[in-house]
Amino acid sequence: MAESLNGLKRTVMCGELRESHIGQKHVVMGWVQRKRNLGGLVFVDLRDREGILQVVFGEEINKEAFEKADLVKPEYCIAVEGELVRRESPNEAMPTGMVELKGQNIKILSESETPPIYIKEDLDTDEAVRLKYRYLDLRRPDMQKIFKVRHKTAKVIRDFLDENGFLEMETPMLTKSTPEGARDYLVPSRNYPGMFYALPQSPQLFKQLLMVSGYDKYFQITKCFRDEDLRANRQPEFTQVDMELSFVDMEDVIALNEKLIQKVFKEVANVDVQLPIQRITYKEAMDKYGSDKPDLRFGMEINDITDAVKDVDFKVFKDAIENGGSVRAIKAPNCATMGRKQIDKLGEFVKTYKAKGLAWIAYKEDEIKSPIAKFLGEEGINKVIESLDAKVGDLILIVADKDSVVLQSLGALRLEMAKRLEILKDNKEFRFAWVTEFPLLSYNEEEDRYQAEHHPFTMPMDEDIEYLESDPGRVRAKAYDIVLNGEELGGGSIRIHDTKLQEKMFNVLGFTSESAWERFGFLLEAFKFGPPPHGGLAYGFDRMIMFLAGTENIKDVIAFPKNQNAYCPLTEAPNVVDEKQLGELGIGVQKQK
């Protein structure tokens, strides 16, 4: 039967007690990790958010407390009053391992059924079970460590931005749907039947309005929502650290955020980030790494060998070059002895990225093996080896096709090889980079129009503005992403604040004046009243915590996440609502066949 506290007050957390507290009387409260009955003594490991403390009950200490302690089971919630003493058998593996509490009084605050999951670190349990019983999963010490990291990170960010003159301001959760990119989550309006709010994909438009309003420096740590197909490490609702600044250029935003990154990683994870952070253009990132978020912790860079093979009589290479494509390669060190079956699997791998196949050259000490040797000849093979500065033991992997296919497939193959060779196993390095000079626009062949790579309010680079209408694909953006170990940590841009330039941008994107005003009229109207030059950046806060806490699963850093199907096993959301609620909203549900 559950007991009440009856005025009993906790004096200290379990994990805080040390030798300096010996001789003091304390009250601790928490959950029973385990219990051992050794005849005349009962030992209870008591756990709270700060750690585990051993409590000993004995007939000679207090018989009533001893008998009650013998009734407890794992995950019972209890309160214990007693005196802290030195342990006879210390456990140096525990922070509290030199002391124990002599239990003189115990209250069983609530009982527990046998938990469906073990409350321990490094739990190897099916994810569906963990999510269904998330409140138990969150009791585990390793999970609690993660959320302490999350809390500390948010505090460091808030303190830093406050010290740098930022105001924390909130923007609406119920806003206007402006579909461009991912699908919106829609919220029906009862007051306006047939009309809908949208949950924000980002606070983009409102933070720009705050700059028009003269708030100069804004930030918030806020929820954002995207109704998109969930890939690994994506969630339908996620947290963003969002900021916007007035009267700045790209260098100002980057300089401030480098200091923020340095402070966060030092204070939270004791990682020294050297400034300035390396910069790499979008073109260089794609040409060398086949990715706009390159992992710089290892080499194996992509090399263009088109010139080296342009004269060889090999149809695959010739066709690619004649059609405006290229022939490129990566070299995998110490892989020349890789078996044919393994290489064939790599060939199948690149085909998933639309490559037609994978050519290869194994540069061994006593021979050079390659299925294309008969086409390239000794001279052609040597040209490839020289152009790559290949060494004995290297395996050269080659793709020929249009540039987009070559770069994407070799970029993915580079990461796959690092994984197979365990190049990054136990690698604790943090390699940051700014990626800059992104294309402002990309051409959507299906819709036969240009679309914004970031959003329609991104400022073109000054020297490229003249090409916006005549050659839109050539225009680069004043956009910048901060990349860490092959993942995008955040991204931002300088915004357009010139209404005439914004109109040109909408025109290039295929918006009529009417459709632009229908979607973004409130922002365009505001821009009639002296908007300042402004720009900003947003971090994926959940992804940042993954790095700081050392976990590879985004669900580990969100208290109550959805599963891969955007479903919550704990609350069983989304769920059916009753007809009355739907009727009030003027909504009818069409059942899918």
Curated annotation (Swiss-Prot):
Location of region: Aspartate: 204-207
Organism expressing this protein natively: Clostridium novyi (strain NT)
- Binding annotation for ATP: 226-228, 235, 488, 540-543
Assigned keywords, A-Z: Aminoacyl-tRNA synthetase, ATP-binding, Cytoplasm, Ligase, Nucleotide-binding, Protein biosynthesis
Matching entries from Gene3D superfamilies are given as: Bira Bifunctional Protein, Domain 2, GAD-like domain, Nucleic acid-binding proteins
What family name appears in the similarity comment?
Answer: Belongs to the class-II aminoacyl-tRNA synthetase family. Type 1 subfamily.
Q: Which gene encodes it?
A: aspS
Instruction: List the EC numbers from the record.
Output: 6.1.1.12
List, alphabetically, the NCBIfam families matched: aspS_bact, PRK00476.1
Q: Which GO terms describe its cellular component?
A: cytoplasm
Please report the name of this protein according to its UniProt entry. Answer: Aspartate--tRNA ligase
Q: Name one GO molecular function term.
A: aspartate-tRNA ligase activity
List the lineage, top down.
Bacteria, Bacillati, Bacillota, Clostridia, Eubacteriales
Entry superkingdom: Bacteria
Q: Which residues bind L-aspartate?
A: 180, 226, 454, 495
Report the function annotation for this chain: Catalyzes the attachment of L-aspartate to tRNA(Asp) in a two-step reaction: L-aspartate is first activated by ATP to form Asp-AMP and then transferred to the acceptor end of tRNA(Asp).
GO biological process entries: aspartyl-tRNA aminoacylation
